[in-house]
């Protein structure tokens, strides 16, 4: 196996990518332990990724998603600090599979018109896939705020596909 391509890519990362990566990893670790501070690191990571999505990768739906993450990070921080009525910690939940099926089908259908707009009016690349991943990421973020355990399944699939886009 030739690792020179991997080395070249790692060596070619700029400050925004490194800051985005490091704060993103901290975000995931803190979210795993249900620490509200995770949202602060998520906001920083999203700002860096938004910049790169626009300037280098031309993934406009993803750039919009990062803007959404910045806003939702503030909401998530507030929700996780506030907790439940009476100061109780927000519990971890699991949503029914039918709900996930409906959301996945809905995101797939909504991706067609949204991707058409992005392809027609911007220099977006990979319009449908970028849009589908963006919509599913919005849903996964909602699940994370709700502390739904299934958010991790979404993130594993979404991030695996994003690796190929970047």
Give residue ranges: language-model regions.
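Hydrophobic alpha-helical transmembrane segments of multi-pass membrane proteins
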Residues: 38-54, 70-72
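Polytopic alpha-helical membrane-helix bundles and their juxtamembrane interface segments
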Residues: 1-34, 83-85, 91-166
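Hydrophobic alpha-helical membrane segments of integral membrane proteins
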Residues: 40-44, 61-64, 153-157
């Amino acid at each position: 196996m030739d690792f020179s391509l991997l080395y070249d890519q790692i060596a070619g990362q700029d400050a925004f990518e490194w800051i985005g990566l490091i704060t993103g990893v901290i975000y995931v670790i803190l979210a795993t332990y249900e620490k509200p501070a995770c949202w602060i690191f998520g906001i920083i990571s999203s700002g860096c990724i938004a910049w790169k999505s626009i300037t280098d990768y031309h993934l406009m739906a993803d750039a919009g998603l990062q803007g959404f993450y910045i806003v939702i990070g503030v909401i998530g921080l507030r929700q996780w600090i506030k907790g439940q009525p009476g100061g109780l910690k927000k519990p971890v939940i699991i949503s029914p599979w039918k709900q996930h099926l409906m959301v996945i089908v809905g995101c797939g259908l909504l991706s067609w018109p949204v991707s058409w707009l992005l392809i027609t009016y911007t220099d977006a690349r990979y319009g449908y896939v970028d849009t589908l991943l963006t919509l599913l990421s919005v849903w996964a973020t909602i699940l994370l705020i709700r502390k739904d355990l299934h958010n991790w399944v979404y993130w594993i699939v979404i991030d695996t596909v994003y690796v190929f886009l970047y």
